[in-house]
Amino acid sequence: MKKVVCINDRKQPEGGELVEGKEYEVEKEFINNYEQKTFVIVGINNYGMTKLGMRWYGYDAKRFADLDALATETYEHAYAYN
């Protein structure tokens, strides 16, 4: 499974349980009805209803950074100094 870290936990819909800086595992990845890349996260609530009464399922992928990509950038940066 893909590992990601939350980089934006502001303005979550009602029932959202993301915490900025915490690592999560992605159970499922898909494109929703609004053509947004969406992640279903293991171990937290992934559905609910917004203040306007619209149902939501999964979290927008823009709220996360891929841990594998972050590790590669750090390694390349350290290599440049040596």
Labelled PLM ranges:
Residues M1-R10, E73-Y81:
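SH3-family beta-barrel domains
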Residues K2-R63:
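Basic/aromatic-rich interaction segments and small domains that mediate binding to polyanionic partners
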Residues M54-G58, D66-N82:
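Compositionally biased, intrinsically disordered linkers/stalks adjacent to structured regions
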